[in-house]
């Protein structure tokens, strides 16, 4: 299986600097591995007892078990920040991108989401970051208010249905997949000959 987050760890450890990799801490590697924001949680609490061996097993599982990265839990609060930042950074941008290509219009957004989060990237990011800061301040975890979590959850479901699985995008993704496979086959053949 390919997980972009595990591939990022691989790049840092084995590919960067002409194959020498970088010397980074276990906590940094763990935050990178856990940054995948596809699983929304109301509360992000670190697994402070996670060991190097557990990290290595999680890294291995990302390559060998389907959806393994969805179950990852960062070992530090900073890693939790990285994980939720992934969602915060792309949710509003996905809306603006979908609007710019004509898949979505502002009037299509769920009314309860717009009321709580707003209808553009800037307002959504401001609301999510502000709410997270208010409800996480001086706590050993990160969390959203119930209202913001519900709005964000609704928005993610809406985008999944109306944007990420839109027929036009599905068709284009199928084309891209075929093109990448063809390129891979051509380059593999060149390497073998």
Give the predicted meaning of each segment.
Residues 1:
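Active-site-proximal cofactor/substrate-binding loop regions of enzyme domains
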Residues 5-6, 11-19, 23-193:
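Histidine-centered, transition-metal-coordinating active-site segments
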């Amino acid at each position: 299986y390919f997980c972009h987050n595990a591939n990022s760890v691989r790049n840092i450890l084995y590919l960067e600097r002409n194959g020498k990799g970088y010397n980074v801490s276990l906590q940094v590697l763990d935050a990178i591995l856990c940054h995948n924001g596809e699983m929304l949680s109301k509360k992000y609490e670190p697994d402070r007892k996670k060991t190097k061996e557990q990290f290595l097993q999680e890294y291995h599982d990302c390559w060998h078990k389907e959806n393994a990265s969805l179950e990852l839990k960062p070992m530090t609060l900073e890693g939790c920040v990285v994980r939720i930042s992934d969602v915060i950074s792309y949710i509003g941008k996905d809306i603006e991108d979908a609007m710019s290509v004509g898949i979505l219009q502002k009037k299509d957004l769920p009314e309860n989401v717009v009321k709580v989060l707003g209808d553009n990237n800037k307002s959504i990011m401001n609301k999510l970051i502000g709410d997270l800061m208010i409800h996480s301040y001086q706590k050993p975890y990160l969390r959203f208010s119930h209202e913001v979590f519900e709005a964000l959850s609704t928005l993610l479901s809406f985008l999944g249905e109306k944007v990420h699985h839109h027929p036009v995008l599905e068709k284009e993704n199928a084309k891209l997949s075929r093109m990448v496979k063809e390129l891979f086959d051509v380059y593999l053949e060149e390497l073998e000959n």
